[in-house]
Structure formats: structure tokens, C-alpha cells
């Protein structure tokens, strides 16, 4: 079967390549030579593609053309050109490409991140911005963060003085926060759906050859890959159907907390909508909350502690600030507003370790960018990490220096294109408030209640800073550190 699959790809691609090469526009952006059939796929590093794309951009320029299989792709690697794409010509590049995995896993790509640009996306973005992920709604889940952090304290106090794998601890806590905010406190299927979405996310982010050969999608069926994805999706769908039934059937009191599923059901059944939304649309949004909401927040927290353990003076400075500002035994929302240096640490963490390559964009009409022709249906990648480490925008860009953000107005809103961890323009991530609320609260409380040290015999420079890439980057080896409880 594998030999047949490979043979089918080779033969079909040779035919398609012949026709494609005859109609290549002559004024494309510069880029490396393209090989027959595969184009430039061989140049992509599966572990850290943002790094070798930055290296290629240093040779071919901040706007670079690649052919990945059959997909004509333009890579943007500078703040100036990111501004051109996501500000000046934002509307032209507001669409998303169609991929097999987004169609299957997210109910015909009806989640916010992968939905095609149009009336449906605008409506769902508005619902998410005003109802699901607003600053007010994020604050309403503060009690969940407190309760889950209390559970984490018990584990850390018990483990005081012994090494722990921080990733496991943080992921469990963030998973519980996000799943309770999304599904509620009473769902008995929370753990199953969390485990299933992680498995699904791993498949979604894995290198999928067929996303680069869209005309050969039939091979997904022949190879059995599509059957695996559909089976995985069906298992998740059964549980999501059950969750929706439970939410619709349970009685609600006036003082009950409204989780995100409750909000979506209420809007579907009583909202004044321009377009009706379906249960499948709701399920797509649920999955998006559980995947993007958990992975990005937990990885940011792990990277923040990885960098602070590697830079003990920064750790000490952040701890001193937290312990001088916070007067009680728990960080409050008001306290967080006064933790200026701790916020700089998180901001610098996101500069170096945020989402490296933004969700792909696609133009529906021919465009011109920086004097180059960009044909319709070109896939466009913005290398946010390359922008955040651009030597023309940052001094000593590869070093972790939180103080670089002092006395400037660079923020998360997407107005400063040298720093776009949540994207920019129409497609900026609507979950920014929710994610940052969780990250700031957790980091501050862990600095307040614990001292942290490396395992015996390990020095700061021994920490492995290599990374692997999914939605976000994460350390290739999970950070092991020793919590020292201050309450003992």
C-alpha cells in the first residue's frame, strides 16, 4: 500500500508539475530553486521550521517565494512587510486556505482560526470577542483559576525539595482551567475530551504531506489516513453531542456560572443572528477553545520559568517584585496590574517563544506586495518569530532581556509588527485576554509561594534551549525544577 501511495504521488505530481511550470508568473518574490515534484519541501525543518525559514529569508529577502509540493507559498519575515500584509492589505489576505485536517477536525473549518473570511467568520468573531473571550468574561472565570491553583499548591507543597516536571504540572492545571471555563464544572467527560483533543492536535500539527498536494486528496483515502482522522473525529463528536445534551437539559439557577457552552447555546437559541449557527459550529468552537486555549498558555508558562531558571537575576528580580506588591497570600487581579517587571518577563517570553508562524493566510485575488506579483490562491506565511528577532528592530534580538520593553508602548494588540504573538489585523487571536489572564496569574502566584532551583549538579547554562514546534514552540526536553515551598 505504501509503495502504491508513493508511486501515485510521483506520477500524478510529474503531470501536474509540467502544467504548473508553464504558468508560473515571472515576477514572483525571490526564493530558492525548486526541485521537480517536491518544490522546496525538503528545505522545511519539521522540528523548528521558523528557524530555517528565517535563515532562508536572510539569503533571499524578507518576502520569499517557496513551492511546497503543489502549493505556491510566500513567506514574510520582516515587521515592515508584516505591516503590509496584516494592515495595509489586510482585507486582501484575510482568507484561510482549505486543508484536509481543518475540514475534518473542525467541522468543515467552522472554528474561528480556520474559517474562510466572510459573513460566518465575522459573526463568530463578534460572538467570541463580545461574549466568550472579552476581558469581562475572562474575569468571571477568576474563581476557577484560584481553585485550580489551590490544587496545584497541594502537589507542589508535597513535592517541595524534589524535582518535578513543570510541564506536566502546568498542563494539568491549565487544562482544568480551560475545560471548566468551556464545559462547566459538572461534565464527567472533561478528561476524555482533553485527552482526545491533545491526540487530535498532535495529528493536526504533524507534517501532513497531503496538505501540500491538494489535488491528490484521494490518496488520503487509499492510504487509510483519512479513515484514522474520521474515526478520531467521530469519537470526539459523540462526546460533544452528549455535552450539548447535558447543558440543554440541566436546570439553571440565577446565580449559576455560565460556561462557554452555555453562552453558545443561549446565543444559538435566543440570539439575534445574521446567520443561524448549528451544533456543529458550536462543537468547532469548543474544540478550538480546548486546543488553542490550553497549549499556548501552558507553553508560555513553561518557557517563562525556563528562561528565569537560565537567568537567576531575572528570577530574583521578578520574585522580589511580586513579594513586595502582594500583601496577602494570593495574587489578586488588582495586584497583577502593579506587577510591571513580571509582565515584562512574560512579554519577553512571548517575543522569543510565542507562536512562531501565524496561521496561514490566502488571497482570493491577484495582489502586488513590495513590487512582486502574488497570484490569487497563494498561501502566505508570516514568520512572527523572525519579526520578533529582526536585528533592525531589536538590539541583541536572540537574548532574553525583559528590560527591552521598559518605557515603550509595544503591546499585544498587533499595532507593533515587530511583536505579534497573537497576530494582527482582522485575524488577530480573539483569545488573547483569556490566555494572558491565565498566564499572568499563574506565573505571579508561583513566584510568590515558591523558590525554585535546578536539580543537584545542574547549572543554568546546562538547560537545553532547543525546541520543537506545534501551535507554539516548547522545549525539546521538559523543564525539571525543584519547588521550595515558603509555607513549610
UniProtKB/Swiss-Prot annotation:
Glycosylation is annotated at 407
Q: Decide whether keyword Oxidoreductase is in the record.
A: yes
- EC class, as a word, reads oxidoreductase
For this entry, the protein name equals: Germacrene A acid 8-beta-hydroxylase
> Highest lineage ranks of the organism?
Eukaryota, Viridiplantae, Streptophyta, Embryophyta, Tracheophyta
Q: Which InterPro entries match?
A: Cyt_P450, Cyt_P450_CS, Cyt_P450_E_grp-I, Cyt_P450_sf
Keyword entries, A-Z: Glycoprotein, Heme, Iron, Membrane, Metal-binding, Monooxygenase, Oxidoreductase, Signal-anchor, Transmembrane, Transmembrane helix
Q: Where is the signal peptide?
A: none
> Which pathway does this chain act in?
Secondary metabolite biosynthesis; terpenoid biosynthesis
Q: Which residues bind heme?
A: 429
Tell me what gene encodes this: CYP71BL1
Amino acid at each position: 500500500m505504501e509503495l502504491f501511495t508513493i508511486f501515485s504521488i510521483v506520477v500524478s505530481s510529474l503531470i501536474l508539475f509540467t502544467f504548473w511550470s508553464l504558468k508560473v508568473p515571472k515576477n514572483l518574490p525571490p526564493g530558492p530553486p525548486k526541485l521537480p515534484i517536491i518544490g522546496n519541501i525538503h528545505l522545511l525543518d519539521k522540528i523548528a521550521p521558523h528557524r530555517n525559514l528565517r535563515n532562508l529569508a536572510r539569503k533571499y529577502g524578507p518576502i520569499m517565494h517557496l513551492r511546497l509540493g503543489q502549493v505556491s507559498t510566500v513567506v514574510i519575515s520582516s515587521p515592515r512587510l508584516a505591516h503590509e500584509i496584516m494592515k495595509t492589505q489586510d482585507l486582501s489576505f484575510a482568507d484561510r486556505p482549505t486543508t484536509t485536517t481543518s475540514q475534518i477536525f473542525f467541522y468543515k473549518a467552522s472554528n474561528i482560526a480556520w474559517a474562510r473570511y466572510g459573513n460566518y467568520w465575522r459573526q463568530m468573531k463578534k460572538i467570541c470577542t463580545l461574549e466568550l473571550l472579552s476581558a469581562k468574561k475572562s474575569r468571571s472565570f477568576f474563581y476557577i483559576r484560584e481553585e485550580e491553583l489551590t490544587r496545584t499548591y497541594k502537589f507542589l507543597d508535597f513535592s517541595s525539595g524534589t524535582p518535578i516536571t513543570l510541564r506536566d504540572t502546568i498542563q494539568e492545571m491549565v487544562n482544568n482551567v480551560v475545560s471548566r471555563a468551556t464545559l462547566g464544572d459538572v461534565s464527567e467527560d472533561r478528561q476524555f475530551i482533553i485527552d482526545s483533543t491533545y491526540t487530535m492536535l498532535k495529528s493536526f500539527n504533524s507534517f501532513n504531506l497531503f496538505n501540500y498536494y491538494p489535488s491528490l486528496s484521494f490518496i488520503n483515502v487509499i492510504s487509510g489516513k483519512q479513515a484514522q482522522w474520521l474515526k478520531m473525529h467521530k469519537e470526539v463528536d459523540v462526546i460533544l453531542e452528549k455535552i450539548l445534551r447535558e447543558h440543554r437539559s440541566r436546570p439553571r439557577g440565577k446565580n449559576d456560572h455560565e460556561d462557554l457552552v452555555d453562552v453558545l447555546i443561549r446565543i444559538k437559541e435566543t440570539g439575534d443572528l445574521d446567520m443561524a449557527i448549528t451544533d456543529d459550529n458550536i462543537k468547532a468552537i469548543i474544540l478550538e477553545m480546548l486546543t488553542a486555549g490550553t497549549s499556548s498558555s501552558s507553553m508560555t508558562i513553561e518557557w517563562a520559568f525556563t528562561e528565569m531558571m537560565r537567568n537567576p537575576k531575572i528570577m530574583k528580580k521578578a520574585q522580589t517584585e511580586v513579594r513586595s506588591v502582594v500583601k496577602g497570600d494570593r495574587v489578586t487581579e488588582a495586584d497583577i496590574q502593579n506587577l510591571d517587571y513580571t509582565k515584562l518577563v512574560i512579554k519577553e517570553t512571548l517575543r522569543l517563544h510565542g507562536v512562531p508562524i501565524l496561521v496561514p493566510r490566502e488571497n482570493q485575488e491577484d495582489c502586488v506586495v513590495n513590487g512582486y506579483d502574488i497570484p490569487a490562491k497563494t498561501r502566505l506565511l508570516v514568520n512572527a518569530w523572525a519579526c520578533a528577532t529582526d536585528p533592525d528592530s531589536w538590539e541583541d534580538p536572540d537574548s532574553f532581556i525583559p528590560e527591552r520593553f521598559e518605557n515603550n508602548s509595544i503591546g499585544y494588540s498587533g499595532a507593533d509588527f515587530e511583536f505579534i504573538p497573537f497576530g494582527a489585523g482582522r485575524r488577530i487571536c480573539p483569545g488573547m485576554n483569556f490566555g494572558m489572564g491565565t498566564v499572568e496569574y499563574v506565573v505571579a502566584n508561583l513566584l510568590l509561594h515558591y523558590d525554585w532551583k535546578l536539580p543537584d549538579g545542574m547549572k543554568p547554562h546546562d538547560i537545553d534551549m532547543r525546541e520543537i514546534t506545534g501551535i507554539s514552540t516548547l522545549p525539546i526536553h521538559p523543564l525539571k525544577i525543584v519547588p521550595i515551598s515558603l509555607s513549610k
